């Protein structure tokens, strides 16, 4: 029983020929150094999970500039030294004949100074006494400015100059990721109310340049300009784009129209983009199960006809179903955390290890990171 249908058929994504359609989802794991450089622990983690040739791994949500983040132990890629620290990780993945994209993840705003470089203080607010999501959205986030009711971001007007500086950060980081670190590409993050999504959702209100607020066209201007600048620098085939059209409490009345407009513009302007990566509607804090089979991201596939990655609450059986019915790739987060040989297990119907949620965000430790076991069947196959 080794045939799992479309899920195990090769597919061309950007410049890559993948051997199956199971993708390692980008996550926040806090295993980098205090100043955002890649550690040997991270190299080991990605080496483990790339051992099935032809696997696409999307690496940790990564800061692209001082303006976009800055708290410790989260990867960064905006200096030459930071980019060089990625080289062993990328080489380990390539040695296994797999592929690596780096996700670019700007926070919703500029962190206040007291939180920027105080991991313990930020962790107490963000992750304590609340459910956790390794995709980067702690349950305590309930507004664009506050986490657990504490305002952690500076209140400031987002000027056109600020926006252009953010765009340049994306371009610089993409250049470093592809030309120094030698990653296969980058993924732009427009998810869950973080910076690009905040613009799309109108989350700055009147506190941003008039050209970037109000109408759907204006609200989508910033992410489209980011895509234009980044693809011009490194090529469309090296860029993926992640969205969360059903972002729970942030869902606007016109969210369908916004996402249809955005997807239509991306398809028109960037037809060679590597992929679109969309998060399914789900109940975030009750096990991440898919909300329904009727309401999902398939409406976006009417407008984007290229490679499409879906993520959110999948198990092996629902992944097989999605690939067969929708022709999609399927991203796994928590199951990839707990199963370094996830692709092998799914193909051969081997039960999965269960993840340990308490270890998702333990800084700089192998616990819950590189210590999950491979299946005996996988080890015997080597």
Swiss-Prot record:
<keyword id="KW-0288">FMN</keyword>
<feature type="binding site">
    <location>
        <position position="334"/>
    </location>
    <ligand>
        <name>FMN</name>
    </ligand>
</feature>
<dbReference type="GO" id="GO:0005634">
    <property type="term" value="C:nucleus"/>
</dbReference>
<protein>
    <recommendedName>
        <fullName>Putative NADPH dehydrogenase C5H10.04</fullName>
        <ecNumber>1.6.99.1</ecNumber>
    </recommendedName>
</protein>
<comment type="subunit">
    <text>Homodimer or heterodimer.</text>
</comment>
<keyword id="KW-0560">Oxidoreductase</keyword>
<keyword id="KW-0521">NADP</keyword>
<keyword id="KW-0285">Flavoprotein</keyword>
<dbReference type="GO" id="GO:0003959">
    <property type="term" value="F:NADPH dehydrogenase activity"/>
</dbReference>
<feature type="binding site">
    <location>
        <position position="361"/>
    </location>
    <ligand>
        <name>substrate</name>
    </ligand>
</feature>
<dbReference type="GO" id="GO:0005829">
    <property type="term" value="C:cytosol"/>
</dbReference>
<feature type="binding site">
    <location>
        <position position="189"/>
    </location>
    <ligand>
        <name>FMN</name>
    </ligand>
</feature>
<dbReference type="Pfam" id="PF00724">
    <property type="entry name" value="Oxidored_FMN"/>
</dbReference>
<dbReference type="GO" id="GO:0010181">
    <property type="term" value="F:FMN binding"/>
</dbReference>
<feature type="binding site">
    <location>
        <position position="192"/>
    </location>
    <ligand>
        <name>substrate</name>
    </ligand>
</feature>
<dbReference type="GO" id="GO:0016491">
    <property type="term" value="F:oxidoreductase activity"/>
</dbReference>
<dbReference type="InterPro" id="IPR045247">
    <property type="entry name" value="Oye-like"/>
</dbReference>
<dbReference type="InterPro" id="IPR001155">
    <property type="entry name" value="OxRdtase_FMN_N"/>
</dbReference>
<dbReference type="InterPro" id="IPR013785">
    <property type="entry name" value="Aldolase_TIM"/>
</dbReference>
<comment type="similarity">
    <text>Belongs to the NADH:flavin oxidoreductase/NADH oxidase family.</text>
</comment>
<feature type="binding site">
    <location>
        <position position="189"/>
    </location>
    <ligand>
        <name>substrate</name>
    </ligand>
</feature>
<dbReference type="GO" id="GO:0110095">
    <property type="term" value="P:cellular detoxification of aldehyde"/>
</dbReference>
<feature type="binding site">
    <location>
        <position position="28"/>
    </location>
    <ligand>
        <name>FMN</name>
    </ligand>
</feature>
<feature type="binding site">
    <location>
        <position position="242"/>
    </location>
    <ligand>
        <name>FMN</name>
    </ligand>
</feature>
